[in-house]
UniProtKB/Swiss-Prot annotation:
Primary location class: membrane
Gene Ontology, cellular component aspect: plasma membrane
Record keywords: Cell inner membrane, Cell membrane, Membrane, Transmembrane, Transmembrane helix
Subcellular location: Cell inner membrane
Keyword tRNA-binding among UniProt keywords: no
Species classification: Bacteria, Pseudomonadati, Pseudomonadota, Gammaproteobacteria, Enterobacterales
NCBIfam families attached to this UniProt entry: hyp_HI0043
Family label: Belongs to the UPF0283 family.
Protein name: UPF0283 membrane protein CKO_01392
InterPro entries: DUF697, UPF0283
Species of origin: Citrobacter koseri (strain ATCC BAA-895 / CDC 4225-83 / SGSC4696)
Amino acid sequence: MSEPLKPRIDFAGPLEVEQNQTLKTQQTFSETQAQTFAPAQVDEPLEDEGQAEAVIDAALRPKRSLWRKMVMGGLALFGVSVVGQGVQWTMNAWQTQDWVALGGCAAGALIIGAGVGSVATEWRRLWRLRQRAHERDEARDLLHSHGTGKGRAFCEKLAQQAGIDQSHPALQRWYASIHETQNDREVVSLYAQLVQPVLDAQARREISRSAAESTLMIAVSPLALVDMAFIAWRNLRLINRIATLYGIELGYYSRLRLFRLVLLNIAFAGASELVREVGMDWMSQDLAARLSARAAQGIGAGLLTARLGIKAMELCRPLPWIDDDKPRLGDFRRQLIVQVKETLQKSKTPREN
């Protein structure tokens, strides 16, 4: 039997002709030049923004030097000396029945105890913030794991930290969807699809509300100093609410550390995205011609607040972003533009009447 005829293949583009490389003239190096020759180092670009952030963060992080260790050792020795001297004063006051000195020692002990307790609480909260980064790395490993037994316990721990009750509908759906034959990757993926969006939706609403308030405040208020104070207060409050939402209790130092990480991430990773998002609106809708200068400043402040909230959400979230579940700045941008336009239209309507 004869073979069937194959269909015709049409080539739309022209055939690529191999280009012969031209040979360069020979260069001869002397023995002295050959001995001192060193190849030039070519700077390789970073693979992604995350690697660039890690390099910058490592460069800005203070290194543990010998002087710092000496200072910490001196402070520890001073603390032990204060405690020992206080015990000796207490014993002497008890033996001599000096009740005034004994009361002073008791008051000092209470103050020192309160200070130690405060330091311990701050350290625990700071440790909890650092532990969230380790949990995110653990979740990333589980999402690439084919083992079994660890995913369910890990997700139950995350639900407990976030304050999600066992009777919550989302958690009940997750329990009904998992079974023993699923591996850790499937269990964690189901948790990210069924339970985690509940917290993410609340965080998105907080970001949207804060961004809208910042936008309207800047667009209406005539005082720049009041605007700056209001925006700073709202941004700090937004970070606190997002951290509390994801089960992280912030202290003084942990709040400063989180705020520093958020600003560092925005400065070195989000500038290009922010410029791109704002530029798309300005070019496509010609907002500079339609809105006043104060309204444009309000939209810019609202976008910065939204960017701040997104980065705080990313740092406090126990799971890495999966697929396209990361909130985009463009979603908040369109909402802010609509709110500013409605506010301007409402302000013009009474004047016309």
